[in-house]
Amino acid sequence: MEIAVQCQNPTTDNSDCVVVGIYEGGILSPAATLVDLASGGALRALLDTGDFTGDCGDTQLLYQVPGMAAARVLVLGLGSHGKVKDSQFRKAALAAARALQGARVGRASLHLLDTPVIRRSAPACAKILVQAVADAEYHFDRHKKPADAPQRPISELQLSISENDTAALAELQGAVAEAQATARAVAWTRDMANEPGNICTPTWLAEQAEAMAGRLGIKSTILGPDAMEALGMHLLLGVAHGSRQPPRLIILEYRGGAENQAPIVLVGKGITFDAGGISLKPADKMDEMKYDMCGGASALAAIQAAAELQLPLNIVTVVPASENLPDGQATKPGDIHRSMNGLSVEVVNTDAEGRLILADTLTYVERFEPDVVIDMATLTGACIIALGHQTAAVMGNHEGLVHDLIAAGKESMDRVWELPLFEEYQEQLKSPVADLSNVGGRPAGTITAACFLSRFTENYRWAHLDIAGVAWKSGEHKGATGRPVPLLVEYLLRRARQVA
């Protein structure tokens, strides 16, 4: 989909469809006012019928409106004037995109940047529009017959503003470029995560990462079991023992910054299918455990976006990829493995495997002498109980890093909430037979999982994102969401501005 920003009067816009907004109470946006005047009151007539009220997300498609160059006008409800929140603006944008799809519109022009959104600039609103349209356009249908695959009608999207301000246009075009890179990264993440476990194996995921890296000039290195054994990554290998698919450690290095710039390291959990191992999961919804590699896919996609935007940063992404299956050679509850950093771990529950593969990886990344390390993982069901499906959890050993991630999440509408990592929680990880246990019981499960990881991050600034509640959706709209890619890209953009 091609996206452009232009100064355009909606009445002379010759797109297939022009989109304008109306607020509750019949208040017309500036663009809608121009349409109403040119048409001799067509929008006022619509309001007089009572069929359209301006509620947020309401849509009404009008054909052959007098005085309009476009064949169609989509009227979009924006909610209460002066009180439009970013979440409402996104809801309206999604509704508009779906209405355009339903009308099979090829070229659409959105005259919505005149909408005052609380605490959001015009460039921020442009990003919301682009990402909302991209989300509405996304379909994962590669395994369906062509006749069953939904069409993607929008080929050209124009964001229109009323004033021909060169500086404003340039700023908006920059925001659109960032939003498009983010949207492509989100789509890549969703594509990887939506593939079934018989396709998305650790080896396949590594191959996809290598292909992406090759396209963008990113250095890629893939380690197998022999290299892991030589490094002493026995926690990662212990998780992989139950699978016939060999594990992979995927390492991508993007060097856009100065040679002496310490890298930002992204670590993502890459369990391509998680049956729980010997601590077998219930059958209900076990199919969704293909999404247990969403953290890994997100970390890979974030470096893709950084490379596309040519950010002046050094970034390293490391993804431990494995399956977690039951087998005669699988790790058993009570087994003890020694981690790469020398700590012995009693594996009380083999379904708490994500923290094991992350622990060895967090030790491995010390060799990059990182500025910061951010890991992301669908780690605990307890996080869903605590925060639901709207917000991810963030914890870490550096207050500034945690706050930076919270700010990036707020700006990108990919929000996170901080949970504590008080030292007292470490008591729950004590083991009578090893240096620590891989589980800390039911209380504060999300926190104790992060406490476990913290034992392997003492030599650098670190933050952990538990994305278990936000990485995918169940039910009718089942599928990966692409989170926390928007947060990660926004964080990297902010870091890049600091360098510039």
From Swiss-Prot:
| Cofactor dependence | Mn(2+)
The similarity comment for this entry is: Belongs to the peptidase M17 family.
Organism name: Acidithiobacillus ferrooxidans (strain ATCC 23270 / DSM 14882 / CIP 104768 / NCIMB 8455)
Membrane-spanning parts = none
Reactions performed catalytically: Release of an N-terminal amino acid, Xaa-|-Yaa-, in which Xaa is preferably Leu, but may be other amino acids including Pro although not Arg or Lys, and Yaa may be Pro. Amino acid amides and methyl esters are also readily hydrolyzed, but rates on arylamides are exceedingly low; Release of an N-terminal amino acid, preferentially leucine, but not glutamic or aspartic acids
What is the active site of this protein?
281, 355
Residues reported to bind Mn(2+) 1: 274, 351, 353
Quote the Gene3D superfamilies the UniProt record gives: Leucine Aminopeptidase, subunit E, domain 1, Zn peptidases
Q: How is the cofactor bound?
A: Binds 2 manganese ions per subunit.
Task: State what protein this is by name.
Answer: Probable cytosol aminopeptidase
Q: Top-level EC class, please? A: hydrolase
In terms of PANTHER family, this protein maps to: CYTOSOL AMINOPEPTIDASE, LEUCINE AMINOPEPTIDASE-RELATED
Gene name of the record? pepA
List this protein's GO terms for biological process: proteolysis
* CDD domains tied to this protein: Peptidase_M17
A GO term for molecular function = manganese ion binding
InterPro entries registered for this protein in UniProt: Leucine_aapep/pepB (IPR011356), Macro_dom-like (IPR043472), Peptidase_M17_C (IPR000819), Peptidase_M17_leu_NH2_pept (IPR023042), Peptidase_M17_N (IPR008283)
Q: List localization entries.
A: Cytoplasm
Please explain the role this protein plays, according to its UniProt record. Answer: Presumably involved in the processing and regular turnover of intracellular proteins. Catalyzes the removal of unsubstituted N-terminal amino acids from various peptides.
Family matches, as Pfam families: Peptidase_M17, Peptidase_M17_N
Q: Where does Mn(2+) 2 bind?
A: 269, 274, 292, 353
